[in-house]
Amino acid sequence: MPLSYQHFRKLLLLDDEAGPLEEELPRLADEGLNRRVAEDLNLGNLNVSIPWTHKVGNFTGLYSSTVPVFNPEWQTPSFPHIHLQEDIINRCQQYVGPLTVNEKRRLKLIMPARFYPNLTKYLPLDKGIKPYYPEHAVNHYFKTRHYLHTLWKAGILYKRETTRSASFCGSPYSWEQELQHGRLVFQTSTRHGDESFCSQSSGILSRSPVGPCVRSQLKQSRLGLQPQQGSMARGKSGRSGSIRARVHPTTRRSFGVEPSGSGHIDNSASSTSSCLHQSAVRKTAYSHLSTSKRQSSSGHAVEFHNIPPSSARSQSEGPIFSCWWLQFRNSKPCSDYCLTHIVNLLEDWGPCTEHGEHNIRIPRTPARVTGGVFLVDKNPHNTTESRLVVDFSQFSRGSTHVSWPKFAVPNLQSLTNLLSSNLSWLSLDVSAAFYHIPLHPAAMPHLLVGSSGLPRYVARLSSTSRNINHQHGAMQDLHDSCSRNLYVSLLLLYKTFGRKLHLYSHPIILGFRKIPMGVGLSPFLLAQFTSAICSVVRRAFPHCLAFSYMDDVVLGAKSVQHLESLFTSITNFLLSLGIHLNPNKTKRWGYSLNFMGYVIGSWGTLPQEHIVLKLKQCFRKLPVNSPIDWKVCQRIVGLLGFAAPFTQCGYPALMPLYACIQSKQAFTFSPTYKAFLCKQYLNLYPVARQRSGLCQVFADATPTGWGLAIGHRRMRGTFVAPLPIHTAELLAACFARSRSGAKLIGTDNSVVLSRKYTSFPWLLGCAANWILRGTSFVYVPSALNPADDPSRGRLGLYRPLLLLPFRPTTGRTSLYAVSPSVPSHLPDRVHFASPLHVAWRPP
């Protein structure tokens, strides 16, 4: 007859009416009993012939393609101008005095952050925006492109201008200026002995040697170039040759645009209209950038007719411009859904490309991307805004993967010891935390995102892609991309983006200037950054407890009034460092803090309400007697593992599940095992903080007997049959706890000390976890252990009782997690048998 849940509870000694522990508990270590129970609960039978279940409630396999939903109404979030102060170390020192070595080292790591992968694979531009939403391809394309544009405008991305130069917006850092040797750059054109271009520099090249030099001339340069000098470039056509001050020869743009006659560049050609054509279609530019040898000695200058800003129409008469979008203006509509109708909606479609405020030299960067991007909901609670997902997973894969640095994640007990108190709490929201940390420009060639432009993107989605002649955008192929779907999508998007549609239909390549989220290095750097800042804050405000995990920063103080005044000063301090806080999202928690998925109060720690709800849903949906795919089990174990420390039996209760995942077999829940887990997770007990104290209870064991020293009393007993030493030591610890009720026990066994009972016989592990819940262990060397003699059967000999002090740990080094964090600890071995046959490795 199968084991009922009631019997199983009794067996695990979870009920009060169990017999004496010294008799009952050693039985649970018996191999035969463990095997029989495993068979009864159907835990050992891993090979099943019935088809596996691949979905349980919301849990699907780990690699399942749960299709995210596209929202045509997505708003692109706005990004503040984030500029972390470069002299952050000095500013902190002015505030708190000299920094510790640790704080300095962490802050130097991120000023600037560096990224050197072993190998970078370059992907074609078509892969830049992932076709994640085939139904909404065009809409997704423009929304993503707009998101990238927003990031570039906010100074988070560099825009690749040529193989060796990039432009960006926002305040430059010193390492971005060094790349220009701080020299003034003139570049003159020798094409027709005509006018020269000037691009003036303020330590960085303000723009590349093409085009919109007009705006830059009106800026006061740090080198003191006055606007009048800037115009020396006009009118002195005698100056051929280039006056260049040690600038790398390829900072010139090689655009394949043939000038149709030369003329002055008039100041009236305002910066917009001078951008108007100089883009010379990125498409044609890119098609030969990657292959082009250096062009004429001073690069192709792009020359214009003398165009007043308003005359955007004259550009349709110039026969040369091969801009895909503007070409529709000259062509006859091919149907009612021809793009010509849309292009004729506006006179002035604005520039083909935009340029950043600053220009910079970069290592050789091909016209390719290294990762794809797509949009998803910002978070499950906010579906109105989008979030950009960047997939740089190439750096975590294959034999050339980068081994990301590990960093300390506070474990549950340390967190409770540190934060469980009667303080008042609030949490700060750092807006766009990752985008605070600057990346060295040398990393740009490895972290490229972008898009191939609308025509290529559309062509790739339709079957006609073969006909499009990308090189020349030849007329007869222009209308190949016209279709009803595209027309309707563009008309709707025109309402949102207006003339930006033109800009966004061009190809673009962007590199990260701040750390992106899709690289394993980023969580590490962010953790270093926030923990260093919190460390500084704790020293500056000794009566404030500041703590952080990634971008989650919490402040605690004795009273609400005190907390509010601290909040003001700390906010001002963080703002002075250039850290952007989102004041609307500051949460005041009162005395129970919500942090890292836990609720932490003076009583201890429990999982947050939404996790408790998830647990209930999970058990409601869990099928009985049908094999569940092990990948789905991984998901289930992820959730149950998070809450395991709050249950009676803890992790050991999940061991059968771990075993099936390890052997990659399906798992079948028997009614009893499901009922057992369900009851375990219905009543959650808080994890309490450890108190420091003196240890006065000691336990020790040999394979044949156990001994206890409780104050001045000594006790001993023998086992019916010899047991593996770790099992014996665990039993002795359980006896010590049940006899003395002490929360502090001295032991000389490292496995018991680690409080990981997953490698013991299954039933014993579950029972011991409940008996020893809330117990702290102190290590005592065997030679000094007062329980050593009784365990060997000698009660007469007394060793002096040690007074061993116990200090709870708050060390952040208690658990090293590989970044980004991995699923909860999977043990090396899972045994229903005893650990006797297993060479034990320390945890």
Swiss-Prot record:
Region Polymerase/reverse transcriptase domain (RT), residue ranges: 347-690
EC number(s) stated in the UniProt entry for this protein: 2.7.7.7, 2.7.7.49, 3.1.26.4
Keyword annotations: DNA replication, DNA-binding, DNA-directed DNA polymerase, Endonuclease, Host-virus interaction, Hydrolase, Inhibition of host innate immune response by virus, Inhibition of host RLR pathway by virus, Magnesium, Metal-binding, Multifunctional enzyme, Nuclease, Nucleotidyltransferase, RNA-directed DNA polymerase, Transferase, Viral immunoevasion
Residues at the site labelled Priming of reverse-transcription by covalently linking the first nucleotide of the (-)DNA: Y63
Catalytic reaction list: DNA(n) + a 2'-deoxyribonucleoside 5'-triphosphate = DNA(n+1) + diphosphate; Endonucleolytic cleavage to 5'-phosphomonoester
Any GO BP: symbiont-mediated suppression of host innate immune response
One of the record's GO molecular function terms: RNA-directed DNA polymerase activity
Keyword Iron in record: no
Residue positions binding Mg(2+): D429, D551, D552
Region named Terminal protein domain (TP): 1-177
Region (Disordered): 220-273, 289-316
Composition-biased stretches (Polar residues): 289-299
InterPro entries (UniProt xref): DNA/RNA_pol_sf (IPR043502), DNApol_viral_C (IPR001462), DNApol_viral_N (IPR000201), HBV_DPOL (IPR037531), Rev_trsase/Diguanyl_cyclase (IPR043128), RT_dom (IPR000477), Viral_Replic_Matur_Polypro (IPR051320)
Residue ranges, annotated region (Spacer): 178-346
Keyword Phosphoprotein: no
Annotated Reverse transcriptase domain residues: 357-600
Domain of life: Viruses
Activation and inhibition: Activated by host HSP70 and HSP40 in vitro to be able to bind the epsilon loop of the pgRNA. Because deletion of the RNase H region renders the protein partly chaperone-independent, the chaperones may be needed indirectly to relieve occlusion of the RNA-binding site by this domain. Inhibited by several reverse-transcriptase inhibitors: Lamivudine, Adefovir and Entecavir.
Function: Multifunctional enzyme that converts the viral RNA genome into dsDNA in viral cytoplasmic capsids. This enzyme displays a DNA polymerase activity that can copy either DNA or RNA templates, and a ribonuclease H (RNase H) activity that cleaves the RNA strand of RNA-DNA heteroduplexes in a partially processive 3'- to 5'-endonucleasic mode. Neo-synthesized pregenomic RNA (pgRNA) are encapsidated together with the P protein, and reverse-transcribed inside the nucleocapsid.
Family (UniProt): Belongs to the hepadnaviridae P protein family.
Comment, domains: Terminal protein domain (TP) is hepadnavirus-specific. Spacer domain is highly variable and separates the TP and RT domains. Polymerase/reverse-transcriptase domain (RT) and ribonuclease H domain (RH) are similar to retrovirus reverse transcriptase/RNase H. The polymerase/reverse transcriptase (RT) and ribonuclease H (RH) domains are structured in five subdomains: finger, palm, thumb, connection and RNase H. Within the palm subdomain, the 'primer grip' region is thought to be involved in the positioning of the primer terminus for accommodating the incoming nucleotide. The RH domain stabilizes the association of RT with primer-template.
Further facts: Hepadnaviral virions contain probably just one P protein molecule per particle.
Protein name: Protein P
Species assigned in the record: Hepatitis B virus genotype C subtype ad (isolate Japan/S-179/1988) (HBV-C)
Name of the gene this protein is made from: P
